[in-house]
């Protein structure tokens, strides 16, 4: 099976895990702090602004808690988002308000966001679809003008940027995911970022039961009763650990190589699929925009999309679609019409994209996709007898 996503793990990761085992300390510790500092350097921010957590979902939930969002507050987010984003908002009692997206980029435009703003809006939660930055600069400026907090869900955008500024650092808060299907993997894991170091400090506290000190060793530096606790917030246990952080450090060093290969594969798809009838390829990025190339998406007639996916599966190629419009999900069913999101959901298909793919497999995917499209177009032709 040619997979949609697939991590690359090697001897370097095994060696890093072995070092953690040998240290006899596998929980939160020095390697966690090292990974935070390395990731902060990757973003171009201070290490005190980032917190390594046990998942990207935990990071999303933490953004809502840090901002004290709750009943009576609205948060605008694109309907084409992963469900964890809406869950994080709704869990606080705040209301997710879904906005439409550009039908080709699947990112919201500034106009899409502006139309969804209500008198109760306190924040905007923005996804970078497939790693493409979208109109993040304009949306960040809009949020500042309106006094709204901007949260960037950068799960797809670990290496994305606009004119050298990393996605995730345009707004007030941001999250990244490092699960097994992402570009940089730690098994499970995520990162939280806050532009305001005080919010980052609060997030670190909330991520460990609301405790001001993370361990007895820390407390012993300032008190002769280090077993006493000081609870400043009602928190949870969301922290990462040295095992997953050690993986993250190795994967971060490999990230440029991963991104280069993803870019090569996307370029090959562009060339190999340029003449497939009735198929739209991903839009060209604006000048200064850099994508992480997490998704490679094609768009085709909705009447054949599912049949094409099924035929490719039968040929040993796994494709999929991300993400079903949340305003249509039963638990969030909203009384709104978002035509572009709904149309994109019917037309869009993701092709395999990960550095493990070799050139022969890329050609196989492209060939089988073209065959499937042409077959199902011919089956629907009015000239067919």
UniProtKB/Swiss-Prot annotation:
It comes from Saccharopolyspora spinosa. This is dTDP-4-dehydro-2,3,6-trideoxy-D-glucose 4-aminotransferase. It holds the Pfam family DegT_DnrJ_EryC1. Belongs to the DegT/DnrJ/EryC1 family. It comes from the Bacteria. It catalyses: dTDP-4-amino-2,3,4,6-tetradeoxy-alpha-D-erythro-hexopyranose + 2-oxoglutarate = dTDP-4-dehydro-2,3,6-trideoxy-alpha-D-hexopyranose + L-glutamate. Involved in the biosynthesis of forosamine ((4-dimethylamino)-2,3,4,6-tetradeoxy-alpha-D-threo-hexopyranose), a highly deoxygenated sugar component of several bioactive natural products such as the insecticidal spinosyns A and D. It can also use pyruvate, but less efficiently than alpha-ketoglutarate. Keywords: Aminotransferase, Pyridoxal phosphate, Transferase. It is an enzyme of class 2 (transferase).
């Amino acid at each position: 099976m040619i997979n949609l996503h697939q991590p690359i793990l090697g001897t370097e990761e095994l060696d890093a895990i072995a070092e953690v085992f040998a240290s006899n300390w596998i929980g939160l510790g020095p390697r966690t702090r090292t990974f935070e500092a390395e990731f902060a350097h990757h973003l171009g921010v201070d290490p005190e602004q980032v917190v390594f957590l046990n998942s990207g979902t935990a990071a999303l939930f933490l953004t809502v808690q840090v901002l004290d969002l709750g009943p009576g507050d609205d948060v605008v987010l694109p309907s084409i988002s992963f469900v964890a984003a809406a869950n994080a908002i709704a869990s606080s009692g705040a209301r997710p308000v879904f906005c439409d997206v550009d039908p080709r980029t699947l990112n919201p435009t500034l106009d899409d966001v502006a139309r969804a703003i209500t008198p109760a809006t306190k924040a905007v939660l923005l996804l970078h679809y497939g790693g493409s930055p979208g109109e993040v600069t304009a949306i960040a400026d809009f949020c500042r003008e309106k006094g709204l907090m901007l949260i960037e869900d950068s799960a797809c955008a670990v290496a994305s940027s606009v004119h050298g500024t990393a996605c995730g650092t345009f707004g007030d808060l941001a999250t990244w995911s490092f699960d097994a299907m992402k570009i940089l993997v730690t098994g499970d894991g995520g990162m939280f970022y806050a532009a305001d170091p005080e919010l980052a400090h609060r997030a670190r506290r909330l991520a460990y039961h609301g405790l001001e000190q993370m361990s007895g060793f820390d407390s012993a530096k300032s008190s002769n009763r280090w077993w006493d606790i000081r609870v400043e917030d009602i928190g949870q246990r969301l922290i990462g650990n040295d095992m997953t952080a050690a993986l993250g450090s190795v994967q971060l060093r490999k990230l440029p190589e991963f991104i280069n290969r993803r870019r090569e594969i996307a370029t090959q798809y562009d060339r190999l699929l340029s003449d497939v009838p009735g198929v739209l390829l991903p839009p060209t990025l604006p000048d200064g925009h850099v994508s992480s190339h997490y998704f490679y998406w094609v768009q085709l007639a909705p009447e054949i999309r599912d049949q094409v996916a099924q035929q490719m599966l039968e040929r040993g190629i796994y494709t999929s679609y991300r993400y079903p419009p949340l305003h249509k999900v039963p638990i969030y069913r909203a009384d709104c019409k978002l035509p572009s999101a709904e149309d994109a959901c019917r037309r869009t298909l993701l092709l395999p994209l990960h550095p493990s793919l070799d050139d022969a497999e890329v050609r196989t995917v492209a060939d089988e996709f073209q065959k499937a499209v042409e077959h199902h177009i011919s089956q629907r032709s009015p000239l067919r007898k």
